[in-house]
């Protein structure tokens, strides 16, 4: 999932909405340069305030709307050479970006590369050490007795550590926290302070994430909403989770009469009193449509798999759903909208109730991408009809990370997916076989069992299960403690026989202790959630903790569709995971091709003294999660556009 477009987004949107001049980006990346004129109130990085009134843009600047869309694991890179990538199979979206703006193909996500970490970095402009989510989508925290508990990365912005196993976790620090332990500044504040309503559709931690602590916290423990949680939790989830509008001060949309609640941000720099927000489909939908129930872009009522009308769940955020919410908000006084979209390589059922992985080019995968493309075609046509276009709207479309596909080869190797569907097997494997060589699944490794049987090490520990498992040794020993060093050596020696390839693999690729994690922006302001070390595994493997033996096989490839399956591995640092893409379209955005041109060959970039530019032969403009958040808006331009 994509990173640091947010600071750029604020900069460009503020400049455009305020009627300032966006200077040519020099030898640019295709992104707008910093605004050159206008007043500069504090807290907005030197950019002028947005002239919104009650949620409607009122300035003379070219930008009237901001639409930020972030996919979960949607790929620009091909996962199988003969099969077009996700973005190639969505031509309406891809052509919109490449024909009207810039498609950056050499951006990079953060470590550990997961959904929460990627999105939250993109919302905050901060590396994980300054926003609290170095290990995600969950993490562990040390308790006073030396054992560790579970913290969930997805929790509302002002929540403390959310441990679903207890209402009173011993770690009471903010889930989203700065390096000095305060609550991170919220991403909607630059817009709402300037008078613009800000909408969120499934966007991590800007919406209520659960009906446990979040609903009573926002609405009150004795509220009708809390009573609904107790009496009908399924409907309560659909009513209150996943959708929000954070309003400008005094905006009618978020009035108390419309069920607006105080938008409380206790540590916001400069204070944040008097603002209100709407939380949940139940209260947002009536403000953005006069025709209930709200429908997706295909004309279907938005509901979950059980028929609860409302938010369908975070794994049911197909483009037809997310883009419907976004369009309705934009048409009804919410000019700044952020949306999350589910991945395309898994079968999520009706609304995320199942999880079955497809292989590249498999029929269901290709069909799902076609439906995604149809949704974008309908969305862009609708916006055009509304007068929301590339000439007055800043579009940012990106992903939070890409993936490493774990699987064999298709049964029909010459397939392209589009005209000839690729055929794969979906079976459970514990040993190499003909079927397993064509399987679609990651390889699961029981780290506790392998440690005990291969090294005899039974030191108590827990992990955040992952392609890059974070180890938490009981007692929280120091990095240089003998028990830590021996444990690390033993973990580094583990091997496994891959049921798909038949090869014996060394499990560990790179092992990083706390000193290394600090260098990688992975040590946060909460020392209790810092792991003992992180092990970046061979990228085909997913490490977890099971029994301390291998009576049941410690290494399996569970690909049968009789249960949930996972084949798209991420968390690690390999290029197929961390190299991501971002598309930018709008006023002031230069139309650039990001890639090899006729004279753009290795070793010959035209590059001066500027950030984000390498003299080592990269054909693409290099970006990182926070690179675009810098005050520099002018990068190098390779020869040959």
What is the predicted role of each segment?
Residues 47-53, 306-331, 374-382, 484-525:
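A Trp-anchored, charged/polar loop motif used as the substrate-binding/catalytic surface
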Residues 61-76, 97, 122, 336-341, ...:
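Beta-strand elements within well-structured catalytic alpha/beta cores of enzymes
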Residues 62-67, 99-105, 130, 150, ...:
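Loop/turn elements at helix/coil->beta-strand transitions in domains of secreted/extracellular proteins
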Residues 77-130:
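Short, structured active-site-proximal loop/turn typified by the sulfatase FGly-forming signature C/S-X-P-X-R
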Residues 112-117, 124, 130-259, 264, ...:
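Secreted, luminal/periplasmic, and some membrane-associated catalytic domains
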Residues 203-335, 343:
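Extended, H/D-rich, highly charged conserved domains that either
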């Amino acid at each position: 999932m994509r990173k640091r477009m947010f600071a750029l987004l604020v900069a460009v949107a503020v400049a455009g909405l305020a009627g300032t001049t966006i200077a040519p980006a020099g030898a640019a990346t295709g992104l707008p340069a910093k605004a050159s004129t206008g007043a500069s109130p504090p807290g907005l990085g030197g950019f002028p305030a947005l002239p919104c009134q009650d949620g409607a843009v009122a300035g003379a600047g070219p930008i009237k709307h901001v639409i930020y869309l972030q996919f979960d694991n949607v790929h620009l890179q091909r996962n199988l050479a003969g099969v077009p990538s996700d973005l190639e199979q969505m031509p309406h979206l891809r052509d919109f970006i490449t024909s009207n703006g810039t498609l950056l193909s050499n951006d990079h996500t953060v470590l550990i590369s997961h959904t929460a970490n990627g999105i939250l970095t993109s919302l905050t402009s901060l590396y994980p050490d300054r926003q609290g989510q170095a290990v995600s989508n969950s993490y562990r925290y040390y308790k006073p007795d030396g054992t560790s508990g579970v913290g969930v990365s997805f929790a509302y912005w002002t929540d403390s550590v959310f441990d679903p196993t207890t209402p009173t976790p011993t770690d009471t620090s903010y889930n989203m926290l700065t390096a000095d332990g305060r609550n991170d500044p919220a991403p909607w504040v630059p817009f709402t302070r300037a008078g613009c309503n800000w909408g969120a559709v499934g966007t991590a931690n800007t919406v209520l994430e659960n009906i446990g602590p979040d609903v009573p916290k926002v609405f009150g423990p004795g509220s009708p909403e809390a009573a609904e949680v107790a009496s009908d939790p399924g409907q309560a989830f659909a009513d209150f989770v996943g959708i929000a509008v954070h309003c400008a001060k005094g905006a009618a949309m978020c009035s108390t009469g419309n069920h607006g609640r105080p938008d409380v941000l206790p540590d916001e720099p400069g204070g944040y009193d008097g603002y209100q927000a709407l939380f949940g489909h139940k209260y947002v939908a009536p403000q953005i449509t006069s025709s209930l129930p709200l429908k997706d872009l295909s004309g279907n009522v938005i509901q979950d798999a059980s028929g609860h009308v409302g938010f369908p769940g975070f794994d049911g955020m197909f483009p037809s759903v997310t883009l419907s919410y976004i369009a309705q908000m934009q048409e009804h006084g919410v000019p700044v909208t952020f949306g999350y979209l589910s991945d395309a390589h898994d079968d999520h059922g009706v609304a995320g109730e199942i999880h079955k992985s497809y292989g590249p080019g498999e029929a269901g995968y290709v069909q799902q991408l076609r439906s995604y493309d149809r949704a974008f075609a309908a969305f862009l046509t609708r916006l055009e009809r509304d007068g929301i276009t590339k000439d007055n709207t800043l579009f940012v479309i990106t992903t939070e990370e890409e993936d490493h596909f774990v699987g064999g080869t298709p049964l029909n190797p010459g397939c392209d997916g589009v005209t000839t569907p690729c055929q794969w097997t979906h079976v459970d494997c514990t040993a190499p076989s003909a079927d397993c060589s064509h399987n679609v699944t990651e390889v699961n490794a029981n780290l506790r069992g392998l440690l005990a049987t291969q090294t005899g090490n039974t030191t108590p520990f827990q992990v955040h299960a992952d392609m890059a498992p974070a180890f938490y040794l009981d007692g929280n020993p120091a990095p240089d403690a003998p028990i830590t060093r021996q444990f690390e050596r033993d973990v580094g020696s583990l091997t496994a026989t891959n049921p798909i390839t038949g090869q014996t693999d060394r499990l560990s690729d790179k092992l990083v202790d706390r000193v290394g994690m600090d260098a990688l922006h992975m040590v946060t302001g909460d020392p209790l959630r810092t792991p003992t070390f992180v092990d970046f595994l061979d990228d085909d493997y997913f490490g977890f903790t099971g029994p301390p033996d291998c009576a049941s096989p410690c290494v399996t490839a569970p690909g049968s569709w009789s249960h949930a399956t996972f084949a798209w591995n991420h968390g690690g640092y390999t290029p197929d995971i961390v190299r991501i893409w971002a598309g930018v379209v709008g006023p002031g955005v230069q139309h650039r091709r990001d890639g090899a041109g006729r004279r753009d060959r290795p070793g010959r970039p035209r590059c001066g003294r500027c950030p984000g530019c390498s003299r080592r032969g990269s054909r693409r403009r290099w970006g990182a999660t926070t690179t675009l958040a810098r005050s520099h808006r002018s990068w190098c331009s390779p020869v040959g556009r």
